[in-house]
């Protein structure tokens, strides 16, 4: 009896591990790399079979068997390959918990985007490069910026790389250039020329509204601080040695309010010598500083820059101020200035510093 071959409804011999259910669907039973039984299904035994009417089309059982046998021979985790993209991304994130709040929020945004997209529920071993590209196109159609999509793609590429290292899949579907799929419409960094910088400052110095921000913009241009580092400055400044100690950022979140973060990079903690122009600006800022509300954030108090309520200013305050400043300047001048953000002052500072460094090296 043991030599009797099992047959399907079409009188075809079935191989070891193969069977056919009463509803006509074929089943293949195998043992995964962990020694646990697994099952795969298909309405077709071989590629030439037709899928029954009303049933979802799929590759045949024999094709699935061949792939599984190849995966098992190569040590591929066929079960791990069935985790969804959302599960993979969550697993990747679970391996690095000590992150900044902004990074945590960024992870939440991407996870929500995945949950609201067909890609998120796909098994990772079914995701092809064409699927990843279609995801990028859908994200663009939903209104996501190119840089955001590129950042999300980078995170997913890292997640799929982990899956490759864990022998769950063979290839990384996110191994492609986004610019081959979407047009890079990212606006280039705006850098003020020395002449534009002087025109802007001259306008601010005389303007009734924006003159009160003059010293703050001078300090941004002279130090190149990130705006969150700038907002984190306190009145405890080493004026005797003319040094700014940068060791934290001040940010504000709609959920938790003000909070302190370490600098963005490992080299972010630094001592910054003050130029004479910056030193004079700080002296005026300290002299004209209004009354502060009693507030301690992460052990820091006496923040240097205050809003009209006596609370620390944050990035949003300066973003709005700069927009209004440029709009008003361009309204009364034919020689228009480009639209800038507070971060543009940092770009300008870095460019000027690099130019001076190159000039010094040439002289040497």
Regions found by a protein language model. Give the residues of each.
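Short N-terminal "domain-start" leader segments
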Residues: 2-23
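Short beta-strand/loop motif that positions the catalytic acidic residue
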Residues: 352
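N-terminal core-binding DNA-recognition domain of tyrosine site-specific recombinases/integrases
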Residues: 53-57, 93-168, 186, 208-209, ...
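Conserved small/polar residues in nucleotide/adenosyl-binding loops
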Residues: 355-364
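Conserved tyrosine-mediated DNA breakage-rejoining catalytic core shared by Y-recombinases
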Residues: 232-290
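Basic, Lys/Arg- and aromatic-enriched nucleic-acid-binding interface segment
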Residues: 152, 165, 169-171, 175-227, ...
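N-terminal DNA-binding module of tyrosine recombinases/phage integrases
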Residues: 21-26, 32-133, 287-299
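C-terminal catalytic core of Y-nucleophile DNA break-rejoin enzymes
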Residues: 40, 260-284, 300-324, 341
């Amino acid at each position: 009896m043991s030599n009797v071959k099992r047959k399907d409804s079409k009188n075809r011999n079935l191989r070891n591990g193969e069977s056919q259910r009463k509803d006509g669907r074929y089943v293949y039973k195998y043992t995964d790399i962990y020694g646990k039984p697994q099952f795969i299904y298909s309405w077709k035994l071989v590629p030439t079979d037709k899928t029954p009417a009303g049933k979802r089309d799929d590759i045949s059982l024999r094709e699935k068997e061949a792939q599984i046998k190849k995966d098992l021979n190569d040590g591929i985790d066929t079960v791990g390959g069935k985790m969804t993209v959302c599960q993979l991304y969550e697993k990747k994130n679970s391996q690095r918990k000590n992150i900044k709040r902004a990074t945590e929020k960024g992870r939440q945004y991407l996870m929500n985007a995945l949950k609201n997209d067909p890609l998120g529920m796909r098994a990772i071993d079914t995701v092809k490069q064409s699927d990843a590209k279609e995801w990028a196109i859908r994200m663009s159609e939903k209104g996501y910026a190119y840089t955001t999509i590129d950042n999300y793609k980078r995170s997913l590429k890292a997640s799929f790389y982990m899956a490759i290292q864990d022998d769950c899949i063979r290839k990384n579907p996110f191994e492609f250039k986004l610019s081959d799929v979407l047009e890079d419409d990212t606006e280039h960094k705006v850098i003020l020329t020395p002449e534009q910088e002087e025109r802007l400052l001259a306008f601010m110095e005389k303007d009734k509204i924006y003159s009160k921000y003059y010293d703050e913009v001078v300090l941004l241009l002279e130090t190149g601080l990130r705006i969150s580092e700038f907002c984190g400055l306190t009145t405890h400044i080493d004026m005797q040695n003319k040094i700014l100690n940068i060791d934290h950022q001040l940010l504000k979140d709609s959920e938790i309010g003000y909070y302190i973060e370490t600098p963005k990079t490992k080299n972010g903690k630094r001592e910054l010598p003050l130029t004479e122009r910056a030193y004079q600006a700080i002296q005026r800022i300290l002299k004209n500083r209004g009354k502060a509300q009693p507030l301690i954030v992460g052990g820091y108090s006496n923040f240097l820059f205050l809003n009209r309520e006596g609370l620390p200013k944050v990035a949003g305050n300066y973003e709005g101020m700069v927009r209004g400043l440029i709009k008003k300047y361009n309204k009364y001048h034919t020689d228009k200035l480009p639209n800038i953000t507070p971060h543009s002052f940092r770009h300008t500072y870095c460019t000027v510093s690099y130019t001076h460094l190159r000039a010094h090296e040439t002289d040497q």
